[in-house]
Amino acid sequence: MLRYQASVYGDSYGNDYHLPVQGPSTIASSNGLRSQQSKIIKRPPTNYKSIPACRLAPRRRLFVADGNGVQKSMTSSSGVTFPPPDYMKKMKENYESGKIIYIRRNNPGMKGNQMTGRLTTINSSIRAPSYHATSMSAGSVTLDTSGSAPKYVYRLPKAEYGNKFDENRPASNMYVPAQEPPKQHFTTVPACMSMGGEVVFEEELDDEIADLGADELTGDGFNADKSPKSESPDPYLKSSGPLVQPCMTSKSPSYNLLQRNRLQTSRFACPQQDCFWRGTNEMSMKKHMLVHGPKQPVIYDKTGEAMKVQLVQPKPKGVKCSECDTFAYSRPLLLRHMYDSHGIEAPLVKRTFANREMLQSWLDSLRETHAVEFVVSSGSKKWGRGLQVHYLTCSRSGDQKERPNKKYVRPPRPSIKCGRNCMAYLKIKQNPTVSELQIEGCLHHSGHEIDHTRMVLESNELASIGAIVDAVNEGVDVLGNVETIRSYLGSSGRFRLVTENGLIEQMPIWFEQYHRDMAAFNGTGYRNNSGPIPITNPYLSMTMKPSINGNRRLPYSGMTIKKELESITMKKAVPIRFNGGQLQNLEMNSSIEEYDESKVKIEMDDEDALATQSILKDDFEEFKTEDLFGLGGGDDEILCGGEEASGVTSNIDGILAANLPDNFNDPLCGMDLATDFSGPFDDDVFDELLGLTNFNDRHNNLNIS
């Protein structure tokens, strides 16, 4: 038994229910028995929300009570009002005139926002999926008032079929004609490959899709059920069928909604030859063209000829190599590129410090040992879990800042920027919960010169200095040319960034550092109180060759080597050799002025005196002739009597032997040094032989005990 059936009955079930009625409409109650259908039960007006769950009723009918002769509206059993036939006639006139009619849903239960006017009587429930109407002449219309249909704004089609309306046709049989949708045209080839004259075919819609109403694809529309197609081209359908029945030749107004949900026609195509992109509007076309790069504008000069314009490309991301135009994604990848592509040593350093004080002291020491000054390149970045990362780069890395173009500009200060990216950097990781700091970076430079005075050699660099020392001891002319020195030092380390003047000026200091480290290694095993030498010292596999003229009492004299290397740089005399007391310049440059022999002799005398003072200052009592003339060695390089002495040597023994006065060379050739100098001798005689007549005075001034 039905719980409740909201039905409203009239006097007839035919077309006469459109006639003017004299009474207001009421809602009647029924227990579902056909015998009680003729009885009308008067009830007070009921709003929409007070209606019980009556939506399961098998059908609902419209009832029009007798009125005063003017029908205002029709009311369903659920309280939904519909326009009367006279309003439908007005709607027809609006349709024929091409006016736009907006159909919107009433908002039931919204108090205080009721819209006035005839437009509010049109409810979107007539567009609900479950709407199905039989012939109006049958006198019953089934409605779905669930209120689940969405709000929408709908535009009626234009009056293209206005001449087909029959004015004498009864209002109950009035139907809204459907409009033929425009056919879509597609070419057989893409627009970018079009050569003209291609075959154009019309897209045929699938019959099954065409038969479907908008309700099955979009959940909205007149057709809740499928119905057979009509072969008649007449837009007016039979009265026995639904209100609107779609077919291939007759489409419903809701077909526009179906077409709107389908893909629109591709009106725009990419002009590129290898691109098959299609679009529907101009904005999407412009957005797609950015993929192929911006279009270069055509600029014409005064004569009307096109000028070639080169647009500035965006700056690529990454770190640019200082030796080439390659960009690396990160600093560690840049170091790998420097070694693989250019053969430049770029060691990656990783260290950990307990606190900031230790890190600061280490950074201060880098200024003196590696000639590097780090500056902050960017602000700190926060990673996951509060980890902060700071990036530091070399102070000379980067380009100079552009000065603003103003009327008055201050004189620019000299900038230390080299215009390239130096590969020296530091990345500091700091954890807020832990006090230690993790360091990762590179201490070697690239792209600019470095200060040679702030450069303490590393183990591999000291090995290169040792190779030069060994070559000099073997008699190889290494110091005769700067290019030869660089060939021994190599072009992959920090030596490549030192200028020629800096290399010559710093070479004596590096020689002393080499001998100091070798002495510490052979003796105590400590290096200037800086701690023990690591086990991985490269000197363990390198044998130290003894000096040619016996055990060297003194390291290389900085003053002597400096003057020799300065003469190499000034291209005056390289090398200086003696033959029987006669000074000769074997590689004199003819373009330079004549060499002054007196100046060289004075300088050599001064160097001889200073070297002798150093020997006497070290150990005057144990002074022996072998120390002065180098007779203790197995190889004697003192050649006299017209034979050439060896080239310029960097040891003090060879310099003293080569710089003896002229009157001492001839008698020395016939002397037995072991016999003549084995006993004691007078100081005056020795001074006279060496040409140091004022030696005693100098000795007294030195106060050597």
From Swiss-Prot:
Knockout-associated phenotype: RNAi-mediated knockdown reduces expression of homeobox protein lin-39 in vulval precursor cells at the larval L3 stage.
Family annotation (PANTHER family): PROTEIN CBG06911, PROTEIN CBG17840
Keywords: Metal-binding, Repeat, Zinc, Zinc-finger
GO terms for cellular component: chromatin; PcG protein complex; transcription regulator complex
Residue spans, zinc finger C2H2-type: 268-292, 319-342
InterPro entries named in the record: RegFact_GeneExpr_CellDeath, Znf_C2H2_type
Region (Disordered): 215-239
The protein, known as: Zinc finger transcription factor family protein 17
Its job: Probable transcription factor. Positively modulates expression of homeobox protein lin-39, perhaps by binding to regulatory regions of the lin-39 gene, acting in the vulval lineage.
Molecular function (Gene Ontology), one example: RNA polymerase II cis-regulatory region sequence-specific DNA binding
GO terms classed as biological process: regulation of transcription by RNA polymerase II
Gene of this entry: ztf-17
Keyword Oxidoreductase recorded: no
